[in-house]
UniProtKB/Swiss-Prot annotation:
One of its GO terms (molecular function) is glutathione binding. It comes from the Eukaryota. Isomerase that catalyzes the conversion of PGH2 into the more stable prostaglandin E2 (PGE2) (in vitro). The biological function and the GSH-dependent property of PTGES2 is still under debate. In vivo, PTGES2 could form a complex with GSH and heme and would not participate in PGE2 synthesis but would catalyze the degradation of prostaglandin E2 H2 (PGH2) to 12(S)-hydroxy-5(Z),8(E),10(E)-heptadecatrienoic acid (HHT) and malondialdehyde (MDA). The keyword Nucleus applies. The chain crosses the membrane at residues 57-73. Synthesized as a Golgi membrane-associated protein, and the proteolytic removal of the N-terminal hydrophobic domain leads to the formation of a mature cytosolic enzyme. The gene is Ptges2. The lineage of its organism: Eukaryota, Metazoa, Chordata, Craniata, Vertebrata. Residues 262-376 form the GST C-terminal domain. Widely expressed. Expressed in brain, heart, liver, colon and lung. This is Prostaglandin E synthase 2. GO terms for biological process: positive regulation of DNA-templated transcription; prostaglandin biosynthetic process; secretion. Its main location: Golgi. Glutathione binds at V147, D163, S164. Residues 1-56 are lumenal.
Length: 384
């Protein structure tokens, strides 16, 4: 019974296996009032009356400290990157060959799917460790308890990268600039703050920004507009698109059961956990999906929001280029594709392909990733 209770708690309180349902509680951003309070404190406003020890004050102070820390790392990057580039040897091996990557994931998590899409498209070999969503013993080494987690070994240096967007930005910066990964990840420092519910949340500075010099940025993007566009839509995928997944795949009891059947088949569950997850999890997530629908202010028919989001993306890509990145996918293409891919095989995905204009772009993305030079992925079988 204790294990059943533990499983039910995980399914109700955590987020990510196709959802906001199998990992940790959804991140709640600071409200406009909290941010306004931070602005007054940062500006030294004497009229700001805030109670001592208030969670909002603590959040604002943490946010201010995090912002200052991010600025410090950005300035330091400009100085240090010039030295690192000067030290580069023209005879060095391709950077991707010097990395050994291990991805800790839930296969059905949209954030993990984003990272896999990036790694596959860039032909970066990696080992996959599927995490048991109940016990999570595979990531007991980490104080950061969300997935994806990427462990990267570069020579004698072993680094842990957290947060899907940070992982992608850091690796892309590493591939383009040639800076040591150990140095690159310092440009994305974590910061902690209190949200309006009084709970501590962790965010990362610069998470959508690639740390490139002007020449590298020009070669990669061709102009500031393309860089800004990529960042905007990467953030849109995280802040909006991903929140449409759970309400759509758990829309009805039948869809919820089909979704958890898929999660159990693709995930790492013990026999008892699998049975509990399929039926208890489906029932729990059907109910939770209604709460998520209200939280994110979705329409009565959540499919409409999904179709509108897909069509909004297609409109942004436009008719004159196959991808937002032009002739090849950029990081925004990979993010949107990675999020949507977790619905494959489910009714919501089939409806999306039929009732929106996204299918041609989606099929182009599939081909682009399939045509990338093949890499060898190792998925070790771990016994429960």
């Amino acid at each position: 019974m204790a294990q059943a209770a533990r499983l039910s708690w995980v399914l109700v309180s955590s987020r990510c296996a196709l959802t906001e349902g199998l990992l940790t509680r959804p991140w709640q951003p600071l409200s406009a009032q909290s941010r306004a309070g931070f602005t007054r404190v940062a500006a030294g406003s004497r009229g700001a009356a805030v109670r001592k020890g208030s969670p909002r004050l603590l959040g604002a102070a943490a946010l201010a400290l995090g912002g200052a820390l991010g600025l410090y790392h950005t300035v330091r990057w400009h100085q240090r990157s010039q030295d690192l580039r000067a030290e580069r040897s023209a005879a060095q091996l391709p950077l991707s060959n010097s990395l050994q990557l291990t991805l800790y994931q839930y296969k059905t998590c949209p954030f993990c799917s984003k990272v896999r899409a990036f790694l596959d498209f860039h032909s970066l070999p990696y080992q996959v460790v599927e995490v048991n969503p109940v016990r999570r013993t595979e990531i007991k080494f980490s104080s950061y308890r969300k997935v994806p987690i990427l462990v990267a070994q570069e020579g004698d240096s072993l680094q842990q990268l957290n947060d899907s967007s940070v992982i992608i930005s850091a690796l892309k910066t590493y591939l383009v600039s040639g800076q040591p990964l150990e140095e690159v990840i310092t440009y994305y420092p974590p910061m902690k703050a209190m949200n309006d519910q009084g709970k501590e949340v962790t965010e990362f500075c610069n998470k959508y920004w690639l740390m490139l010099d002007e020449k590298e940025a020009q070669q990669m993007y061709g102009g500031k507009e393309a860089r800004t566009e990529e960042m905007k839509w990467r953030q849109w995928a995280d802040d909006w698109l991903v929140h449409l997944i759970s309400p759509n795949v758990y829309r009805t009891p039948a869809e919820a059961l089909a979704s958890f059947d898929y999660i159990v088949r693709e995930g790492k569950f013990g026999a008892v956990e699998a049975a509990m997850a399929k039926y208890v999890g489906a029932a729990a997530m059907y109910l939770i999906s209604k709460r998520l629908k209200s939280r994110h202010h979705l329409q009565d028919d959540v499919r409409v929001d999904l179709y509108e989001a897909a069509n909004k993306w297609v409109t942004a890509v436009g008719k004159d280029r196959p991808f937002m990145g032009g002739q090849k996918p950029n990081l925004a293409d990979l993010a949107v594709y990675g999020v949507l891919r977790v619905m494959e095989g489910l009714e919501a995905f089939d409806d999306l392909m039929r009732h929106s204009h996204i299918q041609p772009w989606y099929l182009r993305m599939e081909r682009a990733i399939e045509e990338a030079p093949s890499v060898h992925h190792v998925n070790p079988s771990c016994k429960d």
